[in-house]
UniProtKB/Swiss-Prot annotation:
SS bond list: none
Protein EC: 2.1.1.77
Main location: cytoplasm
Entry similarity comment: Belongs to the methyltransferase superfamily. L-isoaspartyl/D-aspartyl protein methyltransferase family.
Gene name linked to the record: pcm
HAMAP family, A to Z: PIMT
A GO molecular-function descriptor: protein-L-isoaspartate (D-aspartate) O-methyltransferase activity
Name of this protein: Protein-L-isoaspartate O-methyltransferase
Length: 205
């Protein structure tokens, strides 16, 4: 089932690199969804978690991972842990060589994600923190990449400031009556911002 999903994403042009393809095949999505949705784990759709959170659709996880240009040794910050699935895919995309720090504002979700990640052997590569992701995670900054998995009203300056020079942030932003996914690259004290596509995420809390 995972292979069919990955083949479909590759055919649709969402999956472009062998690195992200292997990452998606390596992470068992069914282990990160609620029990009642296990049979739907390899459908390309978001699925409900709890506390008004969702696990992102596989095509969106793939797209965001591709946009940060993953490579071994990277330091990645994820804002919005959810069930831990996206963080696990990022860890595989950097071949578990590097670090993924993930921040979740809902304590119950942070605990749930940490349990999932530990059970599947990601402890030591992925670290989960319960805190306000809009402020980033200054302790381990600067980062090669930041992935935000909830829609912000605007691009938080605290997150931009925690990017390395040349670092990439992928973030959905509320615009008008919709949301736009942006790829933001830090260049010294300035940023380059490129709109990627229209998206639909839960709001950043």
């Amino acid at each position: 089932m995972a292979k069919k999903l990955v083949d479909d994403l590759e055919r649709e042009g969402v999956l472009k690199s062998e690195r992200v393809k292997k990452a998606l095949l390596s992470v068992p999505r069914e282990e990160f969804v609620m029990p009642e949705y296990r049979m739907m784990a390899y459908e390309d759709r978001p699925l409900p978690l709890f506390a008004d959170a969702t696990i992102s659709a596989p095509h969106m996880v793939a797209m965001m991972c591709e946009l940060i240009e993953p490579r071994p040794g990277m330091s990645i910050l994820e804002v919005g842990t959810g069930s831990g699935y996206h963080a696990a895919v990022c860890a595989e995309a950097i071949e578990r060589r590097g670090k993924v720090y993930t921040v979740e504002i809902v304590k119950g979700l942070a605990i749930y994600a940490a349990q999932n990640l530990e059970r599947l052997g990601y402890w030591g590569v992925v670290e989960v923190f319960h805190s306000d992701g809009k402020r980033g995670l200054e302790k381990f900054a600067p980062y090669d990449a930041i992935i935000v998995t909830a829609a912000a009203a605007s691009i938080p300056s605290a997150l931009v400031n925690q990017l390395k020079d040349g670092g990439i942030m992928v973030i959905p932003v509320e615009e008008g009556f919709g949301q736009v996914l942006y790829k933001v690259v830090r260049r010294g004290e300035k940023t380059e911002k490129k709109a990627v596509t229209y998206v639909l995420f839960v709001p950043l809390r």
